[in-house]
Amino acid sequence: MASLRLFTCLTYFTQVAFPGGNAQISSAQLIDIIPKREVLYVGGRYTNITASLDSHSFYIYVEKLSPNPAPANPPLPIIFIAGAAQTGTNFLSTPDRRPGWASYFISKGHTVYLSDQPARGRSFWFPGQGNIGYIGPPDSVSDIFTDVAHNGNQWPQAKLHTQWPGTGRIGDPTFDAFYRSQMQFQTDRFISEEQNAQAYSALVDLVGSCYIISHSQAGAYGWRVGDMRSDLVKGIIQLEPSGPPFTLRPPFGNDPAFAFGLTDLAIQYEPSAGKNAENIETIIEPAIDADHNECIMQKDPAKQLTNLGKIPELVVTGEASFHAPYDYCTVKYLEQAGVDVEYADLGKEGIHGNGHMFFMEKNNLEIADRVYQWLKKH
């Protein structure tokens, strides 16, 4: 019974003021409660897998976690979309068993929806659909995510990483717990983007007006859903989103990608980008300094994102992450295309030492509060 309680309980935060800087929340400010919990399977379709076999595929497993008791005037619910090889557990708690972002936002009255992408975790995958891969060997995961300061300076800001709990290497219990949480995932970007766009649009239809918080690989999916449901998505928070526009960047190479700027598949521009983005013309803008990448932008006059332009956005970047050299390009591109976007470059705001997984690092609640302050205005 005790283990079941540990599994189902979330730590609920009392309403506390977060001062600026590196303020932390103490355990004395926490009380244990059990939020209202529902499990859903959303989206997907019946598909002919073989000549003699039908199946229902491409849906997502979803946990709905609501404040209990419900507040009288609740804020809009939040849909979380995790990044590559991750699941909804990213936001449930941290690998060293501290409260995650779900607990924080429930404490503020939000209902949260945690989910596993199609073909991942508790969401069905049938062998033969696309290409299924895995996160990579432990040392690579350490170098990119958890022990960035000792990765041989793979990007200029890497040495600034201080916020991961523990050593970030094999044998450290926090790293081992994090690595065990990694899941198989669809590596075909086009299949994955379309399946996620359809599944999460179905979830938005079910939820109604909401915010989306998407991380990393799921950045493109958050944008696709916003483009498809611009009447219901009231704000998009991008945690180091996929990108930058039109290209990959190290540590994942420099190949062309994201033909529609933010996505691989079509989103709405005015004038039209064309069926295959053939009408988008680009230029290269020099990097702002030696620690940042150059940006690929549209030629003027820039086409405007007609649907995404209706939705305010917040982009959040960790000081030491591999996104630090280029997320500013994504923000510039959004601005150029007519999106109302705010950039939380955490290091410049006095929140230091974070890598790509900042929502589970030592100061995760301070960053959650930064997001919450934005939500309160939107």
Residue ranges of model-derived segments:
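N-terminal cap/lid segment of alpha/beta-hydrolase-fold proteins
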Residues: I25-A72
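Short beta-strand element of the alpha/beta-hydrolase
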Residues: N73-G83
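Fungal secretory targeting signals
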Residues: M1-A23
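Gly/Ala-rich beta-loop-alpha elbow adjacent to hydrolase catalytic centers
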Residues: I213-G222
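Short beta-strand/loop motif that positions the catalytic acidic residue
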Residues: G309, V315-T317
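Catalytic active-site module of serine/aspartate enzymes centered on a nucleophile-bearing elbow/loop
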Residues: E349-H378
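Short substrate-entry loop that stabilizes the transition state in hydrolases
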Residues: A84-K108, Y113, G121-R122, P245-F246, ...
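Conserved acidic catalytic loop of the alpha/beta-hydrolase fold
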Residues: A70, Q163-P165, R169-D176, R180-Q184, ...
